[in-house]
Amino acid sequence: MRTLWIVAVLLLGVEGSLVQFEMMIMEVAKRSGLLWYSAYGCYCGWGGHGRPQDATDRCCFVHDCCYGKATDCNPKRVSYTYSEENGEIVCGGDDPCGTQICECDKAAAICFRDNIPSYDNKYWLFPPKNCQEEPEPC
């Protein structure tokens, strides 16, 4: 119950796709993005630098790159619509920006699910000083 309270407090004031991304990760990977991926490796969480530490961290790197390629929108604030059909996430709606961000989030959620075996607790709360290598291009 305490964990649920912490999650609720952390989500206060969070807008748009961040909440939707959390819900999508829960649906696809069956785990909380906030609790598993918000402070993992060099790229999961706010910011990102250095080289991805493993396949899970690479999911976040690719997600950051995808957000960077989204045109004319603020990825962390735009809302989007999606549905689940036959176990698949389907992005919808009339907003091109929202659709781009939804597709980025969908790819990341699938990547997290597919790379659960690579998750290593040593990368949780990974010190930024360990992320100083030259970053690779998107």
UniProtKB/Swiss-Prot annotation:
Tissues expressing this chain: Expressed by the venom gland.
Record's signal peptide: 1-16
Cofactor dependency: Ca(2+)
Disulfide bond entries: 42-131, 44-60, 59-111, 65-138, 66-104, 73-97, 91-102
Effect in UniProt of substituting residue 132 to R: In Strain: Iowa) (CH-E6
Keyword Cell division: no
Residues holding Ca(2+): 43, 45, 47, 64
GO cellular component: extracellular region
Cofactor binding remark: Binds 1 Ca(2+) ion.
Family from the record: Belongs to the phospholipase A2 family. Group II subfamily. D49 sub-subfamily.
PANTHER family named in the record: PHOSPHOLIPASE A2 FAMILY MEMBER (PTHR11716), PHOSPHOLIPASE A2, MEMBRANE ASSOCIATED (PTHR11716:SF9)
Annotated protein name in UniProt: Acidic phospholipase A2 CH-E6'
Species in which this protein is naturally found: Crotalus horridus
Phylogenetic classification of the source organism: Eukaryota, Metazoa, Chordata, Craniata, Vertebrata
